[in-house]
Amino acid sequence: MTSDEKSATRDIYDPNTLPDYDREFIDPDDLRQFEKALNAPEAAPLVALNDWRPVNQRVRKSRRTKPRRSKDETREGVLYTVLKWPFLFTVFAWITVLGFAYTLTRLYIFLYEQFVTWRGKRERLRKELSMQTNYQDWLKAAQALDTYLGNLKWKETDEYAYYDHLTINKVVAQLKQTRKAAETEMQNGRSGLSDPPAVEELCFLLEACVKNNFAGVENPRLYSETYSGTKDLVQEYIDEVHSCIRLVLDSKQISNEDKYQFFKHLDTNFGRTALCLSGGATFAYYHFGVIRALLDNDVLPEIITGTSGGALVAALVATRTDEELKQLLVPALAHRIRACHEGFTTWVRRWWRTGARFDTLDWARQCSWFCRGSTTFREAYERTGRILNVSCVPSDPHSPTILANYLTSPDCVIWSAVLASAAVPGILNPVVLMTKKRDGTLAPYSFGHKWKDGSLRTDIPIKALNLHFNVNFTIVSQVNPHINLFFFNSRGSVGRPVTHRKGRGWRGGFLGSAIEQYIKLDMNKWLRVLRHLELLPRPLGQDWSEIWLQKFSGTITIWPKSIPSDFYHILSDPSPERLARMLHVGKQSAFPKIQFIKNRLKIENAIMQGLQQCSSGGGRVMSPILSRRRQDRAEEHADRMVERLDQSFPERQSDYKDESHYTEVSDSLSATSSRPHTPDARRSSMFEEMRRQSAVFFDDSDMYADEDAVTT
């Protein structure tokens, strides 16, 4: 190791190199207001019995204790009372047996992969892959492993059952020909003024094919057969669409207004990408490595959501610029993580007295550094351009959850939302959200109601993100320990193909995968039965079945690999050495997904750039959906965060009347293709069509997702 490398290594462990390391952002007055809100009595309506009796008359305390549940809630009957506990114990016993069988099945699959498939040169290449610390070196090692396993031939072949390669072939050919015609017109001028310009035909083509998961090109299975990249045809489609969008943006034959309407249409159809960070106590520090990998490769989405421990990481990311994050996401950051610094006797006495292990005010003080003091969601967006979302659950079990962001709660203080999202019963008592008033002082938010851990109901708020920000592509970093134990992709995951049969087999063989799926689904079934029959106990007034039955995955799911010692340190601060390992593991788990994310953001960023350049107001431009929602809220708030875009959202208008020429071009190109595997004639045979449809497979990863698990 050279002297420069040794110096760089020392720097990443030196806390003095961290920006704002010694700075305390929190204002003591803010903490006092927060303490006052926490100690405020619960609001209770006072209603007199009648006009002559007092409101609070003295009555003797009844000796009869109030039942835990009312009959109206549980619909008690004779059979319910008699069969409840025997049925509950029987189901729990069966789930225990299934859990033991599941452990044996996973052990068999692990031994099968370790001692049957990973041997010889394949094992050596895999070890080299796991030792890489940056993406470029990792990519070279992944390509070497793909070459050895013969995966390059799979990339060169167009046919695959999980996407429509025939449609993609035709679209690529049409885009290429129309783009070349548009480039010729831009250089030499139009030859015939009666015909519409080629760039308009290109816009029609793009409006037809720039959609979320068009023809299956964003199916994760397309990236699950190799360690790097995807089908050559899919990559060609992504590159061609990007080139065509750039040509439309640079064209002088279309006005800025028409371009803006065009990009609004594309943005609505294509949607947005969001990064979702799960909870998981100190397991959430693996998110730092995931963030660092995405940041170093310029694929960090603007929309970020976090829950519980993931909310702390998301708050750090949303309140810092890229340059600040690159300096912060190093092992020295462990010196600022001091949430669990108290001794055993201190927290035991507190837990016995208050029912919570940690002190809320101390956590508020520690958390404020990660959130840059009492920064609000609106202020964080104005500073970095990132949209922070934090999932919070009300302490009242009958109230809906909230996804706090700069649209739903713009003046809410971030550190209060992070504390609320991390308030697990028994660990931290429910807290009050705080809002910043115009004079800069803090006050209780939402009438002083208290909130708790968002993971209890909505660890990954996919539906709320789609509602507020048109998100339809989610990157989930999942570190919940109780979920990681049951994570298993029988056909491989993005950048992690199956270890044998050149990635086309089943993990542990078909029988091993079938047994694993059956046992896991059976356990899930019995938990749902207990929940729907209202048989599950509710410790601390919480339905704990949601921590198992909600959806925890996304379009891309990143699963950092934990080790047994992480469970021992689940409620303790990391040392710089342990955080360094978690950073490395987090980056390693994100490297296989980067090419998929790059392809997605390549088109999305081009669309956003078009909105940016073609907008009349300039400045930061949001997507049309965000713009429309922001305009609605601007009528209620005098302080505007960005310049208002036009509130109308019309369909794209074009002066192009005669579409016969475009139809002729489309029909002519449908019969030909530059790719070798496209049939020369139009499919007209019924038997040929039936054969083609029978060869199409669908990704069933979301088939068993609970539709009611994620609320807004």
Curated annotation (Swiss-Prot):
GO annotation, biological process: cellular detoxification; lipid catabolic process; triglyceride mobilization
Region (Disordered): 1-21, 628-687
Annotated compartments: Membrane
Keyword Transmembrane helix: yes
Biased composition regions of type Polar residues, renumbered to the chain: 665-676
Gene Ontology molecular function: triacylglycerol lipase activity
Membrane topology according to the record: Single-pass membrane protein
Enzyme kind, highest EC tier: hydrolase
PROSITE patterns reported for this sequence: PNPLA (PS51635)
SUPFAM superfamilies according to UniProt: FabD/lysophospholipase-like (SSF52151)
Keywords annotated in UniProt: Hydrolase, Lipid degradation, Lipid metabolism, Membrane, Transmembrane, Transmembrane helix
Family, as annotated: Belongs to the PLPL family.
GO terms for cellular component: lipid droplet; membrane
UniProt keyword annotation of ATP-binding present: no
The protein's name in its UniProt record: Patatin-like phospholipase domain-containing protein NFIA_019760
EC number: 3.1.1.-
Function of the protein: Probable lipid hydrolase.
